[in-house]
Curated annotation (Swiss-Prot):
The active site is at 133, 179, 211. The keyword Hydrolase applies. The gene is pyvD. Keywords: Hydrolase. The keyword Hydrolase applies. It holds the Pfam family DLH. The lineage of its organism: Eukaryota, Fungi, Dikarya, Ascomycota, Pezizomycotina. This is Hydrolase pyvD. Initially, the PKS portion of pyvA synthesizes C-10 carbon chain from 5 molecules of malonyl-CoA, which is then condensed with the thiolation (T) domain-bound glycine activated by the adenylation (A) domain. The subsequent chain release by Dieckmann condensation (DKC) could be catalyzed by the TE domain present at the C-terminus of pyvA and/or the alpha/beta hydrolase pyvD, installing the tetramic acid moiety. It comes from Aspergillus violaceofuscus (strain CBS 115571).
Length: 245
């Protein structure tokens, strides 16, 4: 693997405060959070693939709203069929047991159906993928023509080398220098693979933060806040360059 499977370090972090701007709706039987850009355009869009807390985590909705404020329609589906890791999980929660019910055979159909609705119902012409932690794997899996045009992932998990080797679009990676699930040897492996592909790529590394920083860092810590904000800016800049047309 070019990044390791989710583990107990995925279920920590801080809750953030703020008023969300989007709306909860459904694509068929899939709950989705949708946030529109100021001009309500659906031409340039982002499929937001969350971490293991799914739609229940306000942090993710606030980030989705920020992408929308920068000119993108954002759609965040419930990847877990109503079974995310509880935000208020007990210390004994076993993430690996939970993960067995949320592997590609369960998640791929949700991503495929959401992309279809984005293109057919909403009229999206260009779609980028944002993936945090768990969601990063599926940005990589779907970075192909007719699916996702551009990808941005932060502290990704569970990505197989063959999945990364197969991408056909620009990919930007935001990483922590202290991430046990995406350690230096896995970053270097990923860089070696990407260097052999004919696609634009980027890997930014942030010190002083841990796995999950781009979504669940402690905003009261100056360096954590800076890393989170810079990671978000990295994603926006990447999409502005490679997605918007």
């Amino acid at each position: 693997m070019t990044s390791l499977p989710p583990s107990q370090c995925c279920i920590g972090g801080s809750l953030h405060e703020g008023e969300t701007q989007g709306e909860l709706t459904k694509f068929g039987d899939i709950p989705v959070y949708v946030s529109y850009p100021p001009d309500k355009s659906t031409h340039n869009a982002i499929l937001f693939l969350s971490d293991i807390f799914g739609l229940a985590l306000v942090n993710s909705k606030l980030i989705a709203d920020l992408f929308a404020a920068n000119g993108y329609l954002v759609v965040m589906p419930d990847l877990f069929q109503g079974d995310p890791v509880p935000v208020d999980h007990s210390p004994s929660f076993q993430i690996m047991d939970w993960l067995q019910g949320h592997l590609p055979p369960q998640t791929d159909p949700i991503v495929t159906a959401t992309l279809r609705e984005m293109r057919e119902r909403l009229g999206c012409q260009r779609i980028g993928g944002v993936g945090y932690c768990y969601g990063g794997k599926y940005v990589v899996r779907y970075l192909h023509p007719g699916q996702l045009d551009v990808g941005f992932v932060a502290h990704p998990t569970f990505i197989e080398p063959d999945e990364l080797k197969a991408i056909e679009g620009p990919l930007s990676i935001s990483a922590s220098a202290q991430d046990n699930l995406f350690p230096p040897e896995k970053r270097h492996e990923s860089e070696t693979i990407l260097a052999q592909l004919d696609v634009p790529y980027q890997i930014n590394i942030f010190s002083d933060v841990e796995h999950g920083f781009a979504v669940r860092c402690d905003l009261n810590k100056t360096r954590h806040r800076f890393a989170k904000e810079q990671s978000f800016s990295q994603g926006v800049t990447w999409f502005n360059q490679y997605l918007k047309k």
